[in-house]
C-alpha cells in the first residue's frame, strides 16, 4: 500500500501510548496558548484574511491583511507549505505549480459532527470502522482518486470518556472519512456519505 508511513505513528499513539484530551476539549488548549501569548505581549488578530506576502530584495517587506499592508520583521507560517508559497510573488517561490502537481499529498477528509439523542452501547471513545477492503479505499485516495466506493472511517465519541460533551442519555460524535484531494464536493455527495456512515453505525 502507498499509505504514508506517518500513519504508523498515529496507530502507535492510539494503541501504544493512548490519547488524551483537555477536560473541556481542545478549545482549552487554544485558550491557554492565547493567554500565554498575551502575558508575553503578543497581540492577536482573529478573523483576518492574509492574502499576500510582499517581498523586496529577497526579504519580506510586508503582508496584506484584509486588503491593508502591514509591515513585519519575521513571518512564521503554520499553514500548509503550498498555500504559504502561493501568497509569495511567483519569482520568490521555491517550487512551481508543475512541482506541486507531481507530489503525492496526504489525504483530505470529509468530517461530520453529529449528536445522537440516545446512548450507543457498542462504541468506545475511539473507533476505526474498517469493515471493508482497506487497499481498495487506499487506491481510491492515491492511485485512482475518486470518492470511495465503500468508505472506511474513524468515529470519535468524546461523550464516552467526558460526559460534559453531551446531554444526559445522548452522545456526541464526529466521523472522519479519508478521501483524495481535489474532489468535486457538493451537498448531494456529503448527504450520500453521511447516509453510508449512519447505516453502518446502526449496527452499533
Would you name each region that the model predicts?
Residues 1-40, 47:
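Active-site/ligand-binding neighborhood in enzyme catalytic cores
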Residues 13-21, 109, 178-186:
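Glycine- and acidic
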Residues 51-167:
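Mid-domain catalytic core of redox enzymes
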Residues 154-155, 159-204:
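FAD-dependent oxidoreductase catalytic-site/capping-region signature
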